Amino acid sequence: MTDLAQKELMVQLGRSFYERGYTVGGAGNLSVRLDDNRVLVTPTGSSLGRLSVERLSVLDMEGNLLGGDKPSKEAVFHLAMYKKNPECKAIVHLHSTYLTALSCLDNLDPNNAIEPFTPYYVMRVGKMQVIPYYRPGSPKIAEELSNRALTGKAFLLANHGVVVTGSDLLDAADNTEELEETAKLFFTLQGQKIRYLTDTEVKDLENRGK
């Protein structure tokens, strides 16, 4: 895909997230690898619903600005994940309602914030690790995500939001949407007796994904 096509897709996805209520104001950011040495990321303070192709930030892997506006302050953790995991091609970070609500709950399992109860959660991301709370923009977030970048596709930032990776922007977006729907179901089912997937069922789904 050309640089221009990647930029147009990012603008399109940002608007789609915004119009469907996955993000508000200037919250959240998106990024995608353009090649081995360059990353496209949303600019600082930008609304995902009002992105423009011309203003999207192009960075090298060291964070130097090659084109467009100044990048989001959270571009640091995007770059850290790309450096650690070559298979990570795109990243979506949102403060979507249900995943952010989930991130504010105490005593979540740090290895998997939601015990699997649908096959789609397992097939899409496998699990969602919980990152301890740090202020937005803290270098500790980049450190934590870098340390885990090879161990999963989805990470819940405590009291903050979600970070989701994919093989491209569309895949990362699809993964994020599946997670938000799973979190919505989690809250909808509160007070009900949930039938969780068994370890055998989870393992079967994981094996089918290999």
Curated annotation (Swiss-Prot):
Q: What does the entry's cofactor note say about binding and number?
A: Binds 1 zinc ion per subunit.
Name of the top EC class for this enzyme: lyase
What InterPro entries does the entry give? Aldolase_class_II_sugar_metab (IPR050197), Aldolase_II/adducin_N (IPR001303), Aldolase_II/adducin_N_sf (IPR036409), OtnC (IPR050013)
Q: Where does Zn(2+) bind?
A: E74, H93, H95, H160
Transmembrane residue ranges: none
User: What family does this chain come from, according to its entry?
Assistant: Belongs to the aldolase class II family. AraD/FucA subfamily.
Q: What is this protein called?
A: 3-oxo-tetronate 4-phosphate decarboxylase
Q: Which organism is it from?
A: Haemophilus influenzae (strain ATCC 51907 / DSM 11121 / KW20 / Rd)
Q: What is the lineage of its organism?
A: Bacteria, Pseudomonadati, Pseudomonadota, Gammaproteobacteria, Pasteurellales
